[in-house]
Each structure stands twice: as C-alpha cells, then as structure tokens.
Amino acid sequence: MDNPNIAIEVVYALADRQKLLRLSVPVGTTVREAALRSGMQQFFPELDLHHAPLGIFGKAVAKPEERVLEEGERVEIYRPLIADPKEVRKQRAAKAKTREEGEEPA
C-alpha cells in the first residue's frame, strides 16, 4: 500500500506581504521538511529555511527536525527579532514617562 499523504499549510509573513501555501506531504513529514518542500523561497529568496525558527499554530517548535506533522496543521516560518523585546519595553516606558512629566496641570 502507498504511503498516504496529509494536507498541511505553510505560511510566512512580512509587514507588507504574506504567503500561505497548501501542500500534500507524506505521512511522517517533519516540520522542517515541510518548510523545505514548500517552495517558500521562490516568493522570499532571503529565507534560510534550513535554519529559520518554525512553529505550528503560533507555538514555536523546539525540534522541527524531529516533530512529525499531523493532518491539517499549519507550519509557520518565523522571522528573526529585529529588536530585543525587553529593550523595546524599556524605551516605550521611558517615552511614556517623558510624556507624563511634560503634561503639567494647568
């Protein structure tokens, strides 16, 4: 008997555009294999699918080379963080404090 396939999706998004691809892959395909099979690099040549962080339905997958996909799952290709989230929060808090200090009662 042939090895059956499962239907999955692979997605990648930038601030200004995104792409969702529907694939049929063999049972036993890992998260990393699905990303590599997707052909997403056709649309985003800068992507390094061999090393990009990956997730399923908004949750990062620690070992995408080992995690086997199930029917209907959506593989998400994550972009690297541009700024450290802690630093961004500090900057936002400092800005808010400066604004508050500037608003003196009349």
Swiss-Prot record:
SUPFAM superfamilies, per database record: MoaD/ThiS (SSF54285)
Domain of life: Bacteria
Range of residues in the leader sequence: none
Entry similarity comment: Belongs to the UPF0125 (RnfH) family.
Stated name of the protein: Protein RnfH
Source species: Ectopseudomonas mendocina (strain ymp) (Pseudomonas mendocina)
Organism classification: Bacteria, Pseudomonadati, Pseudomonadota, Gammaproteobacteria, Pseudomonadales
Gene that encodes it: rnfH
